Amino acid sequence: FGSLAAKTAEVPSRVLTILTNDAARYSILGQRNGLHVTSATQTMMIVDMETQDAEDPWLSDDDLKLETSRTDGVHHAVVSAGEEVAASGRVFVVGHTAIFDNIVTSPAYQRRGLGSFIMKALAAQAFEHDVDSGLLLASLDGQKLYSHLGWRMVCHVLMLSTSNEGSDLSVG
């Protein structure tokens, strides 16, 4: 751990991310090695992709539009209201695992089901590949949504850096 902490400390913006079920232990080890907790609120979650909807979802609001694309093997989904992005996310496949990332709903569009919608749109794109499981890192708010969609927690995600500002790097 000491050598990883030293490498992390070499660059102020570098973050050491630890997947663990013993966050307290690594928080203490980090402190002993000059690192501070910059996030302890995320979890890693998985899902059996057989439980996910394989069809493109339908938007019930005519003012919203779904656009999907694929760039360099990464599938993107964006829901927009005119020129404004209401929700977005991406998924890429490694082996038989769909890795969901950067799922965001703009504050003005939250509590309208767009997070679920984006996840379903991305799952439909992931099914273009032979996928068995899904994987993601979830914020506190995301954990509620993903649990509702059948995802389960595997472990906690602890982020350590030399920054002592106490800001949660998992937000935003």
Q: What are the residue ranges of the model-derived segments?
A:
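Acyl-donor-binding surface of acyltransferase catalytic domains
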Residues: 1-59
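Conserved GNAT acetyl-CoA-binding A-motif
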Residues: 12-21, 126-138
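Conserved catalytic-core motifs of GNAT/GCN5-like acyltransferases
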Residues: 20, 36-47, 137, 152-171
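Conserved active-site alpha-helix within GNAT-family acetyltransferase domains
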Residues: 23-36, 116, 128, 140-157, ...
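Short, basic/aromatic recognition patches
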Residues: 60-67
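A conserved beta-strand-loop-helix scaffold within acyl/acetyltransferase catalytic domains
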Residues: 68-106
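Conserved acetyl-CoA-binding loop-helix of GNAT-fold acetyltransferases
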Residues: 105, 111-124, 148
